[in-house]
Amino acid sequence: MAGQKQELPVSGEPLAVESPMTNKKKKKSKKNKHTEENHEVEEVPQEVTNGVEEELSNKEKKKKRKREEKESEKNKKKDVPEKKLEAEDLGEGESEQQKVVVTGKGVEEAKYAALKTFAESNLPENVLDCCKTFEKPSPIQSHTWPFLLDGRDLIGIAKTGSGKTLAFGIPAIMHVLKKNKKIGGGSKKVNPTCLVLSPTRELAVQISDVLREAGEPCGLKSICVYGGSSKGPQISAIRSGVDIVIGTPGRLRDLIESNVLRLSDVSFVVLDEADRMLDMGFEEPVRFILSNTNKVRQMVMFSATWPLDVHKLAQEFMDPNPIKVIIGSVDLAANHDVMQIIEVLDERARDQRLIALLEKYHKSQKNRVLVFALYKVEAERLERFLQQRGWKAVSIHGNKAQSERTRSLSLFKEGSCPLLVATDVAARGLDIPDVEVVINYTFPLTTEDYVHRIGRTGRAGKKGVAHTFFTPLNKGLAGELVNVLREAGQVVPADLLKFGTHVKKKESKLYGAHFKEIAADAPKATKITFDNSDDED
């Protein structure tokens, strides 16, 4: 903590420890006034002086001062509050410095200092074998490993492509090795020790690939279970004994209810893309699955946003004082490495405009271009339309069998068919390298989904382009989209401003000091599902 400035707590509020670089960045923060209102995670109470207070007599003022002094003295005697660390971090492949905020009890302890190198983790060589191609830990790995390796419950908020799979994967492997005493080899273990929940099949497979590669040098066995494929091989693999299970909520619940999968030994649980999981209507099966794990467990949640329903789930199943690590801004923000082009047009003009854009961006038919549709039937129609126009295209959506989806994704990744049409099933979490252009044929239902869609390009420090069609039907989201564009320093077209810049107020805060802002009597939202592409069999 050398060279850092410490500010004394105000009225019992958490201690803020800031680096000099953080102070520099704060001076620059005035340029986006429209985002300032929601930018602070924790508010410092301030004296509010109204007209009545100004007229207080000297006697009343003295009494008021004494009351404040007594209150201040009481706060000093209370337990030491949670700390908050703020620092600037430059991660692997990041084009600019990004803010890292770590909150929770004991975060200022030396043992929790962010890792600058993999060697500082003091992990066994076979555990770090999967990291040898990386120069240093990414920011999310650097800041979360010290806590996770110490057994702390943790909430991680970071954009996709930040290295979060290994952020929870390496600590999960170490947890299993210690639990099963397998560092030097060990006996066969039937029931799993670690469970990773994913909202989609594609993301589950991607996580499984990473954990299988990371766990093999340590002698660990993992299995990926999801709907849309035969249960037979999955059941056989589980019965033969596994250490780590990765799966989607529907199939996991099915296997638990049929007494094939027993989670009583699971003591390390990860919820990846937690916000997406609940948004897709999986809250009830997620609760059922978590209730079947060991009561003594370490819980990890990763999410791109932190809405109220995810807060409540965390409050119920996590330690009351989890560590919270936020990489980047807590506000909805797009990747600054992506050039965002918004084109306002009539719905009927989209087909011909799409062809014109492909002739511009995909003339070589070798670079990867990802086209987003909103509905499954729309994705099917676009795939046929493009093929009829002579473009080599494939698609992934819920109406396709899992084997077809896997094949389409493989063809796109390897470059055999570098034009992919997808619904939002591919928008979150998937690591598809070298996507040069994203085209939003239909604007998504939320600006959050828009940010995640365009995040498929501009990854690992590379530049990308996102071209979006915006029609009068989307005008209700114009204000939020304008804010996203301005935050990223992008051009806001005059045609978009014609729809207005009003942003509907959200009923609850997205972020706060863990769970303090949760309203116990908040009404449960009614979910409307438009694309059930990930309903489990």
From Swiss-Prot:
Its EC number is 3.6.4.13. It comes from the Eukaryota. GO terms for molecular function: ATP binding; ATP hydrolysis activity; RNA binding; RNA helicase activity. Keywords: ATP-binding, Coiled coil, Helicase, Hydrolase, Nucleotide-binding, Nucleus, Phosphoprotein, Ribosome biogenesis, RNA-binding, rRNA processing. ATP binds at A158, K159, T160, G161, S162, G163, K164, T165. One of its GO terms (biological process) is rRNA processing. It catalyses: ATP + H2O = ADP + phosphate + H(+). A motif (DEAD box) lies at residues 272-275. Its main location: nucleus. A motif (Q motif) lies at residues 116-142. Pfam families: DEAD (PF00270), Helicase_C (PF00271). It is found in: Nucleus, Nucleolus. The keyword RNA-binding applies. The Q motif is unique to and characteristic of the DEAD box family of RNA helicases and controls ATP binding and hydrolysis. ATP-dependent RNA helicase required for 60S ribosomal subunit synthesis. Involved in efficient pre-rRNA processing, predominantly at site A3, which is necessary for the normal formation of 25S and 5.8S rRNAs. Belongs to the DEAD box helicase family. DDX5/DBP2 subfamily. PANTHER family: ATP-DEPENDENT RNA HELICASE DBP3 (PTHR47958). This is DEAD-box ATP-dependent RNA helicase 5.
